[in-house]
């Protein structure tokens, strides 16, 4: 179970100041992060340490992360919002 303090901390780290990232990351943190396994939670935290411009390119699908694990997390987040 995820503690509320951890969720609060991640909520603020997910607010990037770039609207395109905020609309993806903030709801993901609130709605999906608590359901992730420990490995994916750690991966999400690692994703948050990346530069905004890098993440913007990944989420807009202009580029891909060189790290396949980070790219997998990007895909998890995008799959949540993209129509199937």
Curated annotation (Swiss-Prot):
Record localization: Cytoplasm
Keywords: Chaperone, Cytoplasm
GO cellular component: cytoplasm
SUPFAM superfamilies for the chain: YgfY-like
Keyword Cytoplasm: yes
Top-rank taxon, per record: Bacteria
Gene3D superfamilies: Flavinator of succinate dehydrogenase
Cystine pairs: none
InterPro entries: SDH, SDH_sf, SdhE_FAD_assembly_factor
Any single GO BP term: succinate metabolic process
Function recorded in the entry: An FAD assembly protein, which accelerates covalent attachment of the cofactor into other proteins. Plays an essential role in the assembly of succinate dehydrogenase (SDH, respiratory complex II), an enzyme complex that is a component of both the tricarboxylic acid cycle and the electron transport chain, and which couples the oxidation of succinate to fumarate with the reduction of ubiquinone (coenzyme Q) to ubiquinol. Required for flavinylation (covalent attachment of FAD) of the flavoprotein subunit SdhA of SDH and other flavinylated proteins as well.
The family this protein is said to belong to: Belongs to the SdhE FAD assembly factor family.
Protein's name in the database: FAD assembly factor SdhE
Organism: Pseudomonas putida (strain ATCC 47054 / DSM 6125 / CFBP 8728 / NCIMB 11950 / KT2440)
